[in-house]
Amino acid sequence: MLRGGSGAVLMPSTPVEFMLELTPRARVDVIDVRGEVSSRYGDALSGYSRALCCSFHTTAGYLDQSVAARLNQSPDGVMPYIDVFRTMFPEGAGYEHDKIERRTELSAAQRPVEPLNADSHLAFMAGALRTCVSYLNRPGEPMSFIDLDGVHAGRPRTRRTSVIGYSEEETVATARLIVPVSGHRVESVNLKDPNLGVYAQCAELVRQHGVTKGRIRLSLAPGERHAGLTINEYETLLMRHDLGEVLRDPLRFMAEKAGHMLGNPRAIPAKTLNYAKYDLVRVFNRLVDALGLRESRVENILSRAIAMPASRFLRMKRSVSLLVSDREHTGHGHIVEGTYQSPILVQWHRGARQARVLDVTVTRFI
């Protein structure tokens, strides 16, 4: 941070980007990326008022600052919160995504080494983890990278994340897009599908306005209900089967997965979900404790939990952000993302028509 002759604080004039490789210590781990930046680059980030953190993975990411603040951005605060969603989606509970023999997109060489991680994908979406989050840059306050699948076959996986320090963010372009959906009640749409043209239009806006460091915010338009946005792997078995089952009947999904862990997927009859309801109350008690909610709110939350809709079961957001950077070609910004990342529109009830409206906002970091 610089100071002018009058003592006024002067912010750096150019955003700075730090690329980090992280090594998780366990399958589920919390890593302070601020500490990683400090240990490798000193106080180079401290002169900026904001920091954008971006994960390039579909089972590791960040929490919004409001949630992270409740949890104190520390392992002691974050882990109980994450454990709630790991309870909802236990590891190895017979998910369709984990039936590797059915994964036609995998090559013969990929199948033996593909991790069985449907639980991590679902916990990522349910727990409202994001791939791209902007934080107020408060030196000394952790910024937690939360990994839900950091170790495979006993070996830590290499994780990549980017941290951009910037002082201000200005809007340079907006647009409204229409995304067609099917007539099905439960639907997931890959917004990266070239046939939709979403990415092409976003890329053109970035090019027209010469954005080199910034982000693209995709938001559901006001009035769009029973839908959400996430960034994850758009794999058919995961999206159409595992996630689809959650959206259609969250309690039954929990019941069947709990039964599967007991060795009998049908241990809890579909017609009676008392066990699932009981487990759900316990889960929400843990969530309330993790977030430090006031006791006066607990009863209200739990009274709604028994008839909990998918919108509460999955804490999915109404917007996602895509990183724009010129780190690969200086002066030419483009969308930067992980190999398997796709923005996904999810609906759990039909809308008024077979389409959803998205608002696009392109911003530049300065």
Segments predicted by a language model, with ranges:
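Active-site histidine-anchored catalytic micro-motif
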Residues: 2-366
